């Protein structure tokens, strides 16, 4: 059985959740072994808990939608979201990533 390594890191605002790149990446936060990688990602303009590991099985089971792992996000917005905006989140919304449109799954959204 392999001796996998697991690290938990609070990713600060302004840092990319990746190890490659010239600046503003996880390699500037701590000196991690070269074989580990983040499970999932957080955008540069977000902060939060990030699991870093070399366990490919765990990574697959946590990220593959087939396994249905629930995620919780806390967000800060300007103003108070309307009832209509909250319902749109609950129903799923269309987003664009790198020019490609995606429809998000329905979610639990509350204030």
Where are these regions (language model features)?
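RNA pseudouridine synthases
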Residues: 1-111
